[in-house]
């Protein structure tokens, strides 16, 4: 038996290895709890640039099992293998297929799908040596199709804007998605103006929204004038023109009719050439649909005419022509495209842009063909009528066009002197919101209609980073007969898949939330470091106060705020207003003006709730002084009263918490018919906010004084109040700091051991 003798160099090398292993284990133990609670990806970060040029989330390739298609790469990628994957059905079944491919030119690939692939919309994954590139919701596999094609049309989504502010636009967009899924479409069409300013952030939000809210449905869309130049549109949504054949029965063509900077021309001849070639190449397909942003007609009702009829004159102010002003600048292009529509017996032309409904039944006296021109109102932006989406069924045996849901006021293709109609289903009937904080989401749906029931099973996909075992689900119904239930959920990569069952009868509402952390504390309200300006509140001049409202867990409830000044409620304007961000931190900028001549004490009350139901009220005394007076007290101070509890009565809820047993997920469930929670806080808080007539406040060193509220206004004091709000997102600084400390410690230890080793071996 041999004894191995180690010299000092070997001993120090072994010691160094042991120390490094120990440090690695320690780092792993420290980091793991924090890694499991990393913040979810933001909506903008969730969206990725497309690696291909000829298909994408709003222009998926349509193929049958065993067929091949081509794709043009946008970069110099050395692709090693390609696969498709999707999540399907109420059981969230994962489908995954490897694809054969070959390079047929410098950047063009020929990709073939296997015979055994199932129906559905898929993500295409391109894998290189050191990277993976995703084309989300970009391949639509059709084995067989029903004899009815149900189409939902959404136009003018205007991400980044809304009819009043961005928040109202966000609510309309979420409502449109929930309404669309409840209609169970075969296909969804987007008719342009997806972004509001064509910015990268707006277009990335659109990609995330398309993935998150409309996951199971194919979406075919075109850009509009607000997506001008289309560069960001191409980067994140797909090509600006395309032709897709659906099951050899329906041809859908998308063209870009809104290039800016082309004088008196709504369409380029390149687009017309593309349209004509597509119609000619697929002339054998029985039914044809064209999607374009600008409508060819500005009219409501029936037209019996032909492309070269002299009655089709360009629009001029005061004229009665049915030709839209947008195409009137180039009547040659208008007549040429209309002739193509007649020659190839186009079934329908879908448009948007004008933010109202206009339906035209066009019958050609030359070809004896009928084409339906359907122009739809905006889904989310301002409108002279309302926001809505359109749904129609196309019978693939007869070509008949039918409307399965007709809202009150529906007139179809009947003539109307108002040149508009109310044919779309209003998105406001299903008011829906998705609220998120860094580790929290809540979907709420309120069915305002008396004539429509929301009934659907749909998959939502949430950007996610927490493990499956930490997920908590809370689902509740404001009305006992309304259901909004997460029946199944699973985490795959950086996304949480949830199957949601919706059954919400008229005039009922429900909500469901999912979180990765507990919420055990109420929000916090504080003056920021800036506090207020000027440093002395002066009568008859503007005072601006800066507040920060924070909730670290489930975030702030944007529907439950109360702001009162001198006992009178204040309607607060938020800027910017959006709910497509983390709502865990908010900055308030409140501007106040008090008119008068004498030193005046006023009271500002701020009440907020979080998404769990915790609430907090803060009262601030604000003293206004005559000009030139130097105060001896703090002019802005918190009013401290006797501690009292908050009482919150919650609607019936069902809590679902996950526990893991031998690799399988089990559920522990409890149900309460009424929940009351009590919290103690260091300040007096009452959720009733009952307005008193007279209040007396004593502070030190402020002398006792009496203020009179707006019910008994002082003769020398008149209050004018304006407010604004700014949002901010909390950063995960705890993880950054901890990681920095650990890294620095490791570096120092390694350097010290290296120096010691050098000394021993020298």
Language model regions located:
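His/acidic metal-ligating clusters that form di-metal
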Residues: 180-187, 263-364
């Amino acid at each position: 038996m041999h004894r191995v003798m180690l010299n000092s160099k070997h001993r120090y090398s072994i010691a160094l290895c042991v120390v490094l292993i120990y440090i690695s284990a320690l780092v792993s133990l420290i980091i793991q709890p924090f890694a499991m609670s990393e913040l979810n990806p933001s909506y903008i970060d969730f969206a990725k640039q497309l690696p291909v040029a000829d298909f994408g989330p709003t222009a998926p390739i349509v193929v049958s099992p065993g067929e091949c298609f081509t794709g043009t790469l946008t970069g110099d990628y050395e692709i090693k293998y390609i696969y498709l994957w999707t999540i399907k059905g109420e059981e969230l079944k994962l489908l995954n297929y490897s694809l054969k491919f070959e390079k047929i030119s410098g950047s063009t690939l020929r990709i073939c799908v296997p015979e055994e692939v199932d129906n559905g919309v898929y993500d295409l994954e391109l894998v290189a040596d050191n990277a993976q590139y995703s084309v989300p919701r970009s391949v639509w596999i059709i084995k067989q199709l029903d004899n009815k094609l149900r189409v939902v049309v959404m136009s003018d989504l205007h991400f980044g804007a809304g009819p009043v502010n961005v928040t109202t636009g966000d609510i309309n967009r979420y409502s449109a998605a929930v309404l669309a899924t409840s209609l169970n479409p075969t296909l969804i069409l987007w008719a342009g103006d997806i972004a509001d300013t064509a910015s990268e952030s707006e277009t990335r939000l659109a990609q995330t929204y398309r993935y998150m809210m409309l996951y199971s449905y194919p979406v075919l869309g075109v850009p509009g004038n607000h997506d001008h130049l289309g560069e960001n549109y191409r980067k994140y949504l797909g090509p600006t023109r395309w032709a897709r054949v659906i099951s050899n029965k329906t041809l859908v063509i998308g063209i870009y009719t809104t290039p800016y900077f082309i004088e008196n021309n709504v369409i380029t001849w390149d687009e017309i050439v593309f349209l004509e070639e597509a119609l000619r190449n697929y002339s054998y397909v029985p039914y044809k649909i064209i999607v374009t942003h600008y409508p060819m007609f500005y009219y409501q009702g029936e037209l019996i005419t032909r492309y070269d009829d002299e009655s089709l004159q360009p629009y001029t102010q005061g004229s009665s022509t049915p030709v839209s002003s947008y195409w009137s600048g180039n009547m040659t292009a208008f007549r040429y495209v209309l002739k193509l529509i007649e020659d190839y017996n186009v079934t329908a032309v879908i448009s948007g842009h004008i933010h109202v409904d206009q339906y035209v039944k066009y019958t050609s006296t030359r070809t004896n063909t009928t084409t339906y021109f359907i122009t739809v109102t905006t889904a989310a932006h301002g409108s002279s009528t309302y926001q809505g989406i359109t749904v129609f069924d196309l019978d693939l045996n007869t070509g008949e066009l039918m409307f399965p849901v007709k809202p009150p006021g529906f007139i179809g293709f009947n003539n109307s002197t108002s040149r508009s109609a109310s044919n779309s289903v209003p998105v406001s009937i299903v008011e829906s919101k998705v609220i998120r904080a860094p580790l929290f989401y809540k979907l709420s749906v309120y069915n305002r209609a008396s004539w429509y029931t929301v009934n659907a099973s749909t998959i939502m996909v949430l950007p996610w980073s927490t493990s499956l075992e930490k997920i908590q689900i809370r689902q509740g119904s404001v009305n006992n007969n309304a259901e909004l239930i997460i029946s199944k959920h699973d985490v795959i990569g950086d996304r949480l898949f949830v199957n949601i069952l919706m059954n919400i009868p008229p005039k009922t509402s429900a909500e469901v939330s999912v979180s990765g952390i507990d919420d055990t504390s109420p929000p916090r309200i504080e003056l920021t470091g800036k506090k207020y300006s000027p440093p002395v509140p002066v009568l008859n001049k503007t005072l601006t106060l800066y507040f920060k409202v924070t909730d670290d867990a489930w975030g702030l409830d944007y529907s439950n705020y109360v702001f009162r000044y001198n006992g009178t409620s204040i309607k607060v304007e938020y800027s910017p207003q959006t709910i497509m961000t983390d709502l865990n931190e908010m900055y308030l900028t409140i501007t106040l003006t008090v008119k008068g001549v004498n030193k005046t004490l006023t009271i500002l009350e701020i009440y907020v709730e979080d998404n769990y139901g915790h609430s907090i009220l803060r009262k601030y005394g604000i003293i206004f002084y005559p000009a030139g007076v130097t105060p001896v007290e703090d002019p802005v101070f918190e009013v401290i009263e006797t501690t009292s509890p908050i009482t919150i009565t919650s609607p019936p809820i069902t809590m679902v918490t996950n526990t893991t047993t031998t690799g399988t997920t089990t559920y522990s469930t409890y149900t309460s018919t009424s929940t009351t929670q009590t919290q103690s806080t260091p300040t007096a808080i009452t959720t009733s906010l009952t307005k008193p007539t007279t209040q007396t406040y004593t502070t030190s060193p402020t002398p006792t004084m009496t203020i009179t509220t707006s019910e008994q206004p002082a003769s020398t004091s008149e209050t004018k109040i304006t407010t604004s709000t700014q949002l901010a997102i909390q950063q995960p600084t705890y993880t950054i700091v901890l990681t920095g400390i650990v890294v620095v410690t490791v570096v120092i230890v390694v350097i010290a051991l290296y120096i010691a080793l050098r000394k021993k071996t020298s």
